[in-house]
């Protein structure tokens, strides 16, 4: 059986999706080898990985040369970024070393970085005519607001604004936050998507609701039937030109029946396992795209598929 090697960037806890990549590869006639790239080699991914490489920080100027050494030494075919900062690194590596012919299911770095800048992303969505919660501008008569750190993640640092006094606290710091209308009576829907890297063809979308989160990641999630969210996710990918694995976060205003984009992460979401079991085989789509094959278009994912994470232990002995 031919081998297919993956480099998981920041995928220390992605054991579940790692197993699904192995299964998808086997179904396509390949033996998958997973290599982790982490600051600490003693991580859960070691339970299924061939090796864990002690990596550099994403901001380290030597990271591209270090990843290239890893790619050439271990024969990596596909690089999978699993945390925000790794997406731009993976995309830039592919651009710097095109002769390696390593597949990265992500957009170019410029577009990826824009998605992780909430202000720049909101401006892009507005330019493309995509619906988002109205952005606050000085003087607007609205005091039901939410302020999100411009470069924040995992819901950290979010502040609700309910008074003029609270709003005044942001004077002089407006450029550090995205301030928008707050939707209190809402439903938040996550849509797992995949678009072919070369053509942009959307292979499939699968909406789900995060029932429980930890550290901003879904630990309990269920797939749902939401044609409106699915259609908006498809439109967002088409309008922005995003490629590869994409996670679209949508807010449904229940009072006014509005569907709007909260943010888009150009990578696999933490709860994507639910979408795979619901019928949208994301790992298979990524592998087929990497092999130059046309990924099989996913049918509508089954609603009501619930996944929940549980604790397990990986043991490392002194000589491991």
Task: Give, region by region, the residue ranges found by the protein language model.
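A short beta-strand motif that forms the metal-chelation/ATP-contact edge
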Residues: 146-148, 258-268
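ATP-binding N-terminal substructure of ATP-dependent carboxylate-amine bond-forming enzymes
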Residues: 1-104
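Active-site nucleotide/adenylate-binding loops and adjacent lid/helix of ATP-dependent enzymes
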Residues: 98, 109-187, 193, 197-199, ...
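Catalytic phosphate/metal-binding cores of nucleic-acid and nucleotide-processing enzymes, i.e., regions
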Residues: 248
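Short glycine-enriched loops at secondary-structure junctions
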Residues: 38-41, 84-87, 196-201, 251, ...
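Cysteine/selenocysteine-centered motifs that mediate thiol-based redox chemistry or coordinate metal-sulfur cofactors
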Residues: 294-320
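ATP-dependent carboxylate/phosphate-activation module, predominantly the ATP-grasp catalytic core
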Residues: 174-175, 181-242, 252, 265-292, ...
């Amino acid at each position: 059986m031919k081998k297919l090697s993956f480099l998981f960037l920041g995928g220390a806890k992605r054991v579940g999706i790692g197993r699904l990549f192995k299964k998808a590869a086997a179904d396509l006639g390949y033996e998958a080898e997973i290599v982790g790239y982490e600051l600490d080699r003693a991580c859960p991914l070691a339970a299924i990985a061939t090796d864990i490489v002690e990596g550099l920080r994403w901001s380290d100027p030597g990271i591209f040369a270090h990843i290239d050494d890893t790619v050439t030494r271990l024969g990596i075919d596909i690089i999978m970024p699993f945390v925000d900062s790794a997406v731009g690194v993976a995309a830039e590596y592919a651009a710097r070393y095109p002769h390696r012919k390593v597949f990265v299911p992500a957009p170019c770095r410029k577009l990826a970085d824009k998605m992780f800048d909430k202000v720049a992303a909101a401006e892009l969505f507005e330019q493309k005519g995509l619906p988002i919660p109205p952005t606050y501008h000085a003087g607007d008569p609205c005091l039901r607001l939410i302020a999100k750190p411009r470069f924040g993640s995992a819901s950290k640092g979010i502040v609700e604004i309910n008074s003029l006094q609270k709003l005044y606290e942001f004077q002089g710091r407006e450029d550090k936050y995205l301030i928008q209308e707050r939707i209190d009576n809402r439903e938040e829907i996550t849509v797992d998507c995949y678009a072919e890297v070369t053509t942009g063809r959307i292979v499939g979308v699968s909406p789900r609701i995060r029932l429980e989160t930890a550290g901003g990641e879904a630990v309990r999630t269920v797939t749902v039937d939401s044609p409106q969210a699915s259609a908006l996710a498809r439109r967002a990918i088409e309008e922005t030109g995003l490629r590869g694995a994409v996670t679209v976060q949508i807010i449904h205003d229940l009072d006014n029946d509005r569907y709007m984009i909260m943010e888009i992460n150009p990578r696999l979401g933490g709860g994507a396992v639910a979408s795979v079991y619901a019928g949208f085989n994301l790992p298979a789509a990524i592998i087929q795209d990497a092999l130059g094959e046309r990924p099989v278009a996913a049918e509508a994912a089954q609603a009501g598929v619930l996944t929940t994470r549980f604790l397990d232990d990986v043991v490392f002995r002194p000589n491991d």
